Amino acid sequence: MNSTSNLIEQVIEAWQNMQAKTPLVQCITNSVAANYTANVLLASGASPAMIDNPYEAESFTKISSALSINLGTPTSEQMQAMQISAKTAQLNNVPWVLDPVGYGPILAWRSQMTDELLQFKPSVIRGNASEISTLAGNQVQSKGVDSTLSSDQAYQQAFSLLTHASCIAISGESDYILSNEVDAVIQVNGGSPLQPKITATGCALGALIAAYSAVTTPTIAALSAHIHFAIAGKLAANQAQTMGSFSSIFMDYIHMLDANLIEQYADVKLLNKQA
């Protein structure tokens, strides 16, 4: 059984490995999030590549350290690239993260494409509470791509998704990580209410999980990324209460995170699984 202290030690090791290895992360992401996502990865110590052309997808995925697929603003051409890259990642043991943005009956086309991508066994599925709950087969009132469900409600409904991925990460006021590797639900606290008001923070979080997955297991990757964001959000909120200032300082702390800050501020709890 993992203890919280042991998990935090593994997070510190993952952070150190990412700084040492600078993993190359292929991001097939949405037009709103691409720039912010790339900057978050650079600030974190990874190397982003926004390769979403189906004619280049296979060759680039083969040389990538990890793959992040985000369905925020999908085009037909992007969907082709997603399918090619996901299949290539599975065949070449490249860890990959699926972010099913907006999954649900209102956005039926992308949701069907998401269902098809599950066959390629993502390492981690990451989303907000509504997306994850709906993906798990529950009926949830939709509000575009924003969550109408709390994360503590959603994690109870998401265990079935562990047949598709090693790890499920649900973001919210508290974040929850379900895993085939750890016999508990991992709860991560911290962050700031201003984070979801900044465009693309959730999308960038998915890409950061992918970056960490290049240097550690899927569960520790998800935990590391969520802790990274939670600490940066908490410390930024101590210095700024308005969105513009918070956004800038948040990015600074994404860059300035180190082992001492992780050890000092990581707030992790282990909960019993209740499938």
From Swiss-Prot:
HAMAP family for this protein: Thz_kinase (MF_00228)
Q: Needs which cofactor?
A: Mg(2+)
> Which pathway?
Cofactor biosynthesis; thiamine diphosphate biosynthesis; 4-methyl-5-(2-phosphoethyl)-thiazole from 5-(2-hydroxyethyl)-4-methylthiazole: step 1/1
The reaction(s) annotated as catalysed by this protein in its Swiss-Prot or TrEMBL entry are: 5-(2-hydroxyethyl)-4-methylthiazole + ATP = 4-methyl-5-(2-phosphooxyethyl)-thiazole + ADP + H(+)
Which residues does ATP bind? 126, 171
Is Coiled coil included in the keywords of this UniProt record? Answer: no
Write out the similarity annotation. Answer: Belongs to the Thz kinase family.
- Under Enzyme Commission nomenclature, its number is 2.7.1.50
What the entry lists under SUPFAM superfamilies is as follows: Ribokinase-like (SSF53613)
Question: In which residues is substrate bound?
Answer: 50, 200
Task performed by this protein: Catalyzes the phosphorylation of the hydroxyl group of 4-methyl-5-beta-hydroxyethylthiazole (THZ).
GO biological process entries: thiamine biosynthetic process; thiamine diphosphate biosynthetic process
Query: Which GO-annotated molecular functions does the record name?
Result: ATP binding; hydroxyethylthiazole kinase activity; magnesium ion binding
Gene3D superfamilies named among the record's database cross-references: 3.40.1190.20
Recorded protein name is Hydroxyethylthiazole kinase
Key word Phosphoprotein present? no
Q: Which CDD domains match?
A: THZ_kinase
Q: Which NCBIfam families match?
A: PRK09355.1 (NF006830)
Sorted UniProt keywords: ATP-binding, Kinase, Magnesium, Metal-binding, Nucleotide-binding, Thiamine biosynthesis, Transferase
InterPro entries on file: Hyethyz_kinase (IPR000417), Ribokinase-like (IPR029056)
